[in-house]
Regions:
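C-terminal output helix
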Residues: 106-115
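Receiver (REC) domain active-site loop signature in two-component systems and cognate sites
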Residues: 55
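Active-site residues of response regulator receiver
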Residues: 52, 82
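Short hydrophobic/Thr-rich beta-strand motif most characteristic of the beta2 strand and flanking loop
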Residues: 25-32, 40
Length: 120
């Protein structure tokens, strides 16, 4: 089964994402912020990345930009999971290489449906 990197500085949100994904059979690795995620992504390969936008140390947009620069992550689906619903943040995410966008609070079925869609 696919392995997904879940990135959020909120422990409760990470746990909710991980619980939803594990319940659907995915393997999940959690990261507390963009720096933690980048370190994990350099040492392990992930099939999909789900990241918050607003985080300390390295935000989700910077994380996606940095991951896209790595050869292993040029085509990896990357979803932004955030309270930010504004058009300019969405555009920044797209420009950085985000595959999709889910607004918090999210519906677990919506998260799974979106993951399945972007992972083909």
């Amino acid at each position: 089964m696919a392995t997904i990197l879940a990135v959020d500085d909120s422990a409760s949100m990470r746990q909710m994402v991980a619980f939803t994904l594990k319940g659907a059979g995915y393997n999940v690795v959690e990261a507390v912020d963009g720096l933690d995620a980048l370190t994990k992504a350099k040492s392990q390969s992930f099939d999909c990345v789900v990241t918050d936008v607003n985080m300390p140390n390295k935000d989700g947009i910077e994380l996606i930009r940095d991951l896209r620069a790595l050869p292993n992550y040029k085509f990896t689906p990357m979803l932004m999971l955030t309270t930010e619903a504004g058009a300019d943040k969405k555009q920044q995410g797209k420009d950085a290489g985000a595959t999709g966008w889910i607004v918090k609070p999210f519906n677990p079925d919506q998260l799974l449906k979106t993951i399945k869609k972007v992972m083909g």
